[in-house]
Every structure is written in C-alpha cells, then in structure tokens.
C-alpha cells in the first residue's frame, strides 16, 4: 500500500484522532452485530500499546443533523468497547465545542475517548457549508488515522476534510490496510480464474458503474435480486409486479451487449419465488421465468432451479465476489436463496470468496458461515466503489507512505 501506516508514526504520549465505522445495527438499545467494532480493535489496541491517547470518531445511522437524537447516540457502543478494552471509556456528549475540548484535554495516554455521533452536526455530511467543523475535530490531535473503510467512499468532513489538516500525519489503520490489500490483490490485480461476481440488491442504477467495471475483469456475472428483474425485462421476460427500474432497461440492454462482446457470461434467474406481497412470507409459489410471472404477482427470491444454477457457477469458479442479497432475506422463506449462496460460498474452500459488506454480510452472519468466507468486507458501498475506481476519497487523501 502506498499510504502512510500507523506503524510509521511515533505515537508515545501523542493524541490520535481515529475515524472508525461504528455504524452498527441497534435495536432497543442493544447492538445486534458488533463486527465493525471488533474489526477496529487491532488498531485501537496497537495505539494504546504505543502509549497514545485515542480519540474515536464515528457516525451512526442517518440523523437529521443539527440536533441531538437519542436514537442515534453512540451510547450503546460504550459497554461493548469497554468489554473489549477492559477499562472505562468516557463518551463525550458532543464531538465539538467546549465539552468535547475538555474531554480531550483530560484524556491521558493509554486511554480511549469516544466522541458523540459526528452526524449530529451538518458540517459532517456537508463540509462546504461549515468548514469550521473539520477544523475543530482536527485541533484535538497530533495524528489522524482512518480505519473506517465502510465510510471512505463518502467525502464527509471526518473522512475527507479532516485528514487534509494533517499533512504527513494522516495514516491508514490496520482494518483499512487489510481491506485495501485484500480487495486490491485478490479482485483487481491478480484474481484467480474463473472470476465470478454476484450482484444483487434492489437497484441496478446504483450499481451500473461497478457492473461496467466488472465486465472488464470477470468471467461470469450473476445478476439477481431486484436488479435481476430489470435485466429480465431487458430480454423481454414477463416479470409481473416485480421490482423493475423502467429507466434502467436501456442500460441493462447495453450491459448485456457489452458482456457478449467481451465474452463475459451473464447468469440471470430462471425461476422465482413469487407472491402477491412479501411482508408475511405466506401464499408463495415458484414459477419459471420462461413461462413468466403474471400481473398481480412479484418475485421476492430466486427459486430452486436458480439456486442450483448459481451454485454450479460458484463451484466452478476460483474467485467469487458477492454484493447484495438475491431475495428479500429479512422475510422467510424469501431468505432461502441468499442463504444458499452464502452456504455455497462457505463450502467452496479452495476458492477465494469475498463478501462485499452490507446486506450480503448480514446474510452470511445469519447463515452462520462468516468464518468460512475468505474475506467479509466491512464496507458495502465502499467495496463496490473501490472495485469500480480502484480507490476511495477517504484513502486517496491520506499521506503518502514514507520512502
């Protein structure tokens, strides 16, 4: 990696501002999955071992900005952090202002301070409207470390503006290094072949850039989930009331033409679990795509024949990247297709298997097979943008590696 690493920093007695991604799922004040917190621990432990004072910065959810909202407070993070660290972690009630400055001033080397959600301030997501927000955050520390891969595709203040205020002192954390090196080496530089990408999720338009980029490097492209129905419409299949982006049909046709020209094999669903609606998971049946889905019914998951087809493609591949569920996995039985993909990846131990964060990572966790996947990324949108552009705003802006 050509960026400054925390290994290169002289940290003893210094204050370090660490951008982490603690955007974890929370219900009734309890964290449902703490993998993003666990993933940041190697960096935090290293900094503490070097006798640095660690100031953690994160967002959580999508608050309105400009006001405190208890539902998006980082307070539930504190007991989990304390459990991993074995000591008290104070939470500053704000990330800027006098209360935050005092909390930082009182922070001793070898200890950790968590600042409250940066998105409570509009200057985080709209740094041009309030440049002073980044300046206040940067004033706390001697060094800046970005360990928030999952947020580094956004040009937000704590990810993009703050590191610019640390010339030659803005470094990548261990999680960031791991993500960039694994994704770069195994998917961009030297993927073992055949290389298959599986893309699901609702919208095709949000992934058109990465689809076009992948066409130049993959051998097989599996398209399913909501976006799969847009592609099926592009080849004149009847999909009933299934989710279709009408404006995306011409784009889908161009993708199919380009794939054919490049010799990339496209795989689309051949059957689907359909129902009038998906909220209850009842009154469903499987229908062949060839026969068509009638009006009044919609596809909410891939069917048994498609699971068999996609599994065969996976088993014959040496590298597989998966982003986006292939069905409405939150509602059984429409979770069966996504879980089958997860289990097939997990059982293919000789392949390099990469799950690109987000909902696909959630499915792998639900299926109980995350430990059998080569790499489960902490970034959904970030992993896609990295594959599309080979870099991210939050990593580009870090200081260059020391020669």
Curated annotation (Swiss-Prot):
Q: Name one GO cellular component term.
A: cytosol
Which residues does the record give as ATP binding sites? 207, 299, 330, 357-360
Q: In which pathway does it act?
A: Carbohydrate degradation; glycolysis; pyruvate from D-glyceraldehyde 3-phosphate: step 2/5
Reaction catalysed? (2R)-3-phosphoglycerate + ATP = (2R)-3-phospho-glyceroyl phosphate + ADP
Q: Name one Pfam family in it.
A: PGK
GO BP terms: namely:
gluconeogenesis; glycolytic process
List GO molecular-function terms, semicolon-separated: ADP binding; ATP binding; phosphoglycerate kinase activity
Task: Tell where it localizes.
Answer: Cytoplasm
Which residues are noted in the entry as substrate-binding? 21-23, 36, 59-62, 119, 154
Q: What is its EC number?
A: 2.7.2.3
Superkingdom of this protein's organism: Bacteria
SUPFAM superfamilies in alphabetical order:
Phosphoglycerate kinase
Q: Do you know which InterPro entries this protein is assigned to?
A: Phosphoglycerate_kinase, Phosphoglycerate_kinase_CS, Phosphoglycerate_kinase_N, Phosphoglycerate_kinase_sf
Tell me the keywords, alphabetical order. ATP-binding, Cytoplasm, Glycolysis, Kinase, Nucleotide-binding, Transferase
Q: Any keyword Ion transport?
A: no
Q: What is its main location?
A: cytoplasm
Q: What's the family? A: Belongs to the phosphoglycerate kinase family.
Subunit (UniProt): Monomer.
Name of the protein in question: Phosphoglycerate kinase
Gene name, per UniProt, is pgk
């Amino acid at each position: 990696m050509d960026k400054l690493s925390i290994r290169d920093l002289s940290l003893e007695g210094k204050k370090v501002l660490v951008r982490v991604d603690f955007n974890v799922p929370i219900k009734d004040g309890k964290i449902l999955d703490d993998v993003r917190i666990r993933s940041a621990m190697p960096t935090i432990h290293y900094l503490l071992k070097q006798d640095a004072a660690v100031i953690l910065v994160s967002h959580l959810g999508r608050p309105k900005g400009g006001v405190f909202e208890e539902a998006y407070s980082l307070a539930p993070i504190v007991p989990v952090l304390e459990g991993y660290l074995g000591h008290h972690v104070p939470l500053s009630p704000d990330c800027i202002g006098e209360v935050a400055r005092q909390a930082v001033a009182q922070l001793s080397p070898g200890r950790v301070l968590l600042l409250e959600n940066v998105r409570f301030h509009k200057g985080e997501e709209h740094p041009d409207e309030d440049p002073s927000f980044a300046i206040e955050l940067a004033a706390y520390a001697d060094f800046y470390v970005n360990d928030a891969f999952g947020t580094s595709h956004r040009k937000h203040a704590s990810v993009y503006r703050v590191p610019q205020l640390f010339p030659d002192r803005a470094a990548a954390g261990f999680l960031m290094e791991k993500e960039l090196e694994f994704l770069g080496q195994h998917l961009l530089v030297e993927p073992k072949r055949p290389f298959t990408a599986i893309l699901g999720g609702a919208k095709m338009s949000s992934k058109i850039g990465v689809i076009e980029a992948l066409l130049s490097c993959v051998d097989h492209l599996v398209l399913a989930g909501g976006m799969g129905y847009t592609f099926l419409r592009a080849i004149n299949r009847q999909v009933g009331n299934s989710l279709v982006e009408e404006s995306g049909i011409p784009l889908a046709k161009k993708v199919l033409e380009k794939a054919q020209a490049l010799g990339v094999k496209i795989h689309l669903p051949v059957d689907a679990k359909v129902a009038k609606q998906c909220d209850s998971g009842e009154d469903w049946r499987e229908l062949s795509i060839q026969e068509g889905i009638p009006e009044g019914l919609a596809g909410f998951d891939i069917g048994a024949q498609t699971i068999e087809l996609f599994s065969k493609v996976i088993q014959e591949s040496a590298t597989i990247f998966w982003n986006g569920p292939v069905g409405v996995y939150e509602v059984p039985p429409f979770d069966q297709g996504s879980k089958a993909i997860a289990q097939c990846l997990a059982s293919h131990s000789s392949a390099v298997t990469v799950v690109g964060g987000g909902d696909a990572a959630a499915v792998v966790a639900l299926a109980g097979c995350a430990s059998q996947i080569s790499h489960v990324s902490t970034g959904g949108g970030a992993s896609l943008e990295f594959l599309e552009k080979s870099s991210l705003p939050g990593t580009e802006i870090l200081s260059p590696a020391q020669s």
